[in-house]
């Protein structure tokens, strides 16, 4: 799915996106964020897919954003052992070395969450952020998708992608809500 197609699904912005100093944020992160993510939140506020999957805009306060990322990652750091269970599209499990966590080089970086507490992450293993895979985890099992956020969400909505960590019936609709968070 291309960004233009995604915009047609979501419709016009209902709220102004948060003003984000992308250069400052990326400088402080030490990472260039994926283009589709920047496009998404230059156009929209936070998004929620089928009242379940939240995709969060960066906070305009960069220090606060870095704290939010760290807070989101802390439970995963505590749960991860030396190995983690990586599952395939059929739910088959293989034990693999645990993923590093941001700010470790190539670490997992948070971009969203579900109502069940699952985390949506990038694996920042490549210098080219356009090649970062998406990792979905419930804290115990991890699942990998090789593609960007727009293609991931588009694939979920048309049921071309089934994430085995998400409920089987998700999504039950193609509803995408926009919401702003009060500062």
Model-derived regions: residue spans:
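A surface-exposed partner-binding patch
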Residues: 1-116, 181-183
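Short, solvent-exposed loop/turn segments that connect beta-strands within catalytic domains
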Residues: 61, 127-131
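Acidic surface patches and DE-rich sequence motifs
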Residues: 114, 126, 137-138
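Short acidic/polar mixed-charge low-complexity motifs
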Residues: 116-119, 141
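Short, surface-exposed beta-strand/loop micro-motifs that present aromatic residues
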Residues: 119-126
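Short polybasic amphipathic segments
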Residues: 131-137
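Compact, glycine/acidic-enriched structural inserts
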Residues: 142-165
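Acidic, carboxylate-rich catalytic segments that either coordinate divalent cations
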Residues: 161-169, 173-182
């Amino acid at each position: 799915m291309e960004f233009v197609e995604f915009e047609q699904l979501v419709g016009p912005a209902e709220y102004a996106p948060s003003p984000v100093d992308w250069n400052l944020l990326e400088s402080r992160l030490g990472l260039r964020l994926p283009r589709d993510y920047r496009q998404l939140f230059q156009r929209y506020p936070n998004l929620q897919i089928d009242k379940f999957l939240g995709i969060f805009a960066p906070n305009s306060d960069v220090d606060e954003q870095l704290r939010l990322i760290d807070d989101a990652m802390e439970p995963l750091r505590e749960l991860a052992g030396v190995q983690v269970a990586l599952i395939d599209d059929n739910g088959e499990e293989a034990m693999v070395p645990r993923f590093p966590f941001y700010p470790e080089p190539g670490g997992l970086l948070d971009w969203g969450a579900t109502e069940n507490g699952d985390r949506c992450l990038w694996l920042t293993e490549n210098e080219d952020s356009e090649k970062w895979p998406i990792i979905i985890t419930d804290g115990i099992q991890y699942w990998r998708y090789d593609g960007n956020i727009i293609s991931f969400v588009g694939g979920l909505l048309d049921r071309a992608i089934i994430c085995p960590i998400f409920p089987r019936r998700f999504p039950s609709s193609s509803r995408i809500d926009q919401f702003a968070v009060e500062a």
